[in-house]
């Protein structure tokens, strides 16, 4: 059986990266929440 997690830096950045978050309204809400919580890292 193949493992489901096959890491790829590019895929990770495209789906969970800062620019991907900024592209949608909800993504911006995610960033706002993480800023409010005081997260050291906002996105992948």
Curated annotation (Swiss-Prot):
Keyword presence, Protein transport: no
A cellular component term, taken from the record's GO annotations: ribosome
NCBIfam families: rpmH_bact
Keyword annotations of the record: Ribonucleoprotein, Ribosomal protein
InterPro entries: Ribosomal_bL34 (IPR000271), Ribosomal_bL34_CS (IPR020939)
Xref: Pfam families: Ribosomal_L34 (PF00468)
A GO molecular function held by the record: structural constituent of ribosome
Family assignment from sequence similarity: Belongs to the bacterial ribosomal protein bL34 family.
UniProt biased composition (Basic residues): 31-44
Organism field: Actinobacillus pleuropneumoniae serotype 5b (strain L20)
Official protein name in the record: Large ribosomal subunit protein bL34
UniProt region (Disordered), positions on chain: 23-44
GO annotation terms (biological process): translation
């Amino acid at each position: 059986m193949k493992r489901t997690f096959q890491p790829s830096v590019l895929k990770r950045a495209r789906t969970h990266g800062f620019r991907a978050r900024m592209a949608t309204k909800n993504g911006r809400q995610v960033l706002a929440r993480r800023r409010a919580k005081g997260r050291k890292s906002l996105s992948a």
